[in-house]
Amino acid sequence: MSRIGMKLINIPENVEINIGKNNNISVKGPKGDLTNTFRDEININIENNSIIVTRNNDEKESKSLHGLTRSLLNNMVIGVSKGYTKSLEMVGVGYRAEQKGSAINLSVMKSHLDVIEAPDGITIKVEDNTKITVSGIDKQKVGHIAAIIRSSRPPNPYTGKGVRYLGEQVSLKPGKSARAEI
């Protein structure tokens, strides 16, 4: 058995789960609703207010899908009940972010502004011109948008300036050593 796939997923009181045809799962909660379709090799059942994920056979592909399906379902349940957030910070002189409706303009030492639009279900907030918060119910979308923002100017390995996740430790490389006189 898969160590992750064996674990039960507890369903909070305010979350409703429907299992449709072809493993089409819809999860509804106070924050919104998510739907996803999973492979037929995996069985998904609801018993005693928890979700049980099992597999039909012990083929290699089924084993790999077992833990993945359980993790994706757990992310859906947590997303509709609590939601997900990723925070980023901009370090350095001249690095700023500006909110423009649902989009943000990033000034990251380029000749132009980087404009990043928030897709449906994702909200982007800018605080103090240097702190950015990405939030939503879909963990994959939140992480993807946060990664796009970070990739606009990743931290410089020598100075540490750039866009980084809040609390991210950037290991700095040593600079050039002074050349020894002969």
Language model region names:
Residues 1-182:
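Ribosome-associated RNA-binding proteins
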